[in-house]
């Protein structure tokens, strides 16, 4: 019959690395940190949503967060999303974009992010969003 195989299946080294990664995630409480910092970010982003009409939605779980950027008529604002993404990069904060119309800002920081880093991210994003009012 057909033999099933996997490149990494059963490799002692791969298994050892996987075990160590899981141990670090547990020992450093990275899941708890993702929830705590993620909740903080989502709360802060929802505050920004209340101040900027072009934020249509904030959604996510843990540290996987999306911010929908829209036009006044509710349609996808692809160009504005690209502008925000590039301005954040100019400020040395790497974020991405996604979605069928590429109008969702994607925030996926490392599991080790601290609250101080999240505060800086929100402050920088707020400044960039204020600048959008001049850009449009």
Model regions: which residues?
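Conserved N-terminal phosphate-binding loop of PLP-dependent enzymes in the Aspartate aminotransferase
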Residues: 1-136
């Amino acid at each position: 019959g057909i033999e099933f195989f996997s490149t990494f299946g059963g490799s002692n080294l791969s298994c050892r690395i996987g075990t160590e990664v899981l141990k670090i995630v547990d020992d450093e409480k990275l899941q708890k940190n993702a929830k705590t910092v993620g909740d903080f970010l989502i709360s802060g982003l929802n505050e920004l949503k209340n101040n900027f009409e072009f934020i249509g939605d904030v959604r996510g779980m843990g540290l996987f967060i999306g911010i929908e950027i829209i036009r006044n008529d509710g349609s996808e604002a692809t160009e504005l999303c690209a502008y925000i993404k590039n301005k954040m990069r100019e400020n040395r904060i790497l974020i991405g974009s996604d979605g069928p119309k590429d109008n969702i800002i994607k925030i996926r920081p490392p599991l080790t992010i601290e609250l101080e880093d999240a505060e800086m991210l929100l402050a920088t994003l707020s400044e960039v969003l204020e600048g959008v009012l001049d850009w449009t």
